[in-house]
From Swiss-Prot:
EC number: 3.5.1.88
Organism: Chlamydia trachomatis serovar D (strain ATCC VR-885 / DSM 19411 / UW-3/Cx)
Family matches, as PANTHER family: PEPTIDE DEFORMYLASE (PTHR10458:SF22)
GO biological process: co-translational protein modification; translation
Keywords: Hydrolase, Iron, Metal-binding, Protein biosynthesis
Presence of keyword Calcium: no
Name of the gene encoding the protein in the UniProt record: def
Reaction(s) catalysed by this chain's protein: N-terminal N-formyl-L-methionyl-[peptide] + H2O = N-terminal L-methionyl-[peptide] + formate
The protein's name: Peptide deformylase
Enzyme class: hydrolase
Amino acid sequence: MIRDLEYYDSPILRKVAAPVTEITDELRQLVLDMSETMAFYKGVGLAAPQVGQSISLFIMGVERELEDGELVFCDFPRVFINPVITQKSEQLVYGNEGCLSIPGLRGEVARPDKITVSAKNLDGQQFSLALEGFLARIVMHETDHLHGVLYIDRMSDKDKTKQFKNNLEKIRRKYSILRGL
């Protein structure tokens, strides 16, 4: 089932997500729904708060990045439950980011080029992954969602132009009206 997305000014996007304590059938269904939702909106990652669930879970639909920058997508997204970034490189790299919860806007964000992330999968097994480049960026972006942080919070002030802020306000108004706020 494709779930409704939470948008820019939704309070749930600013909350710290609760840890997942048990892997249930409901959690498995949430992951299936998130997978359909991510595919429908053509995302590369999706965090549970973006579909209204304030729990520490996200999915990533990219398996790897080829040398030419082309992305290889997974048949089924990788699941990260209670993820923790355990290592980050000191080298920061700027990259252009967007977010399904802030449709139509993109911005430059500096993030570490390499990370190691530890999490559980849907079978409850702990795993650790060393990632770099775009895959590392996806994991950091989605992990930020679990801490109530949006990519716009990580943009430099100079990149938040008046036009960017005006567009952000238009998004806020549009989706507040759609939600009946």
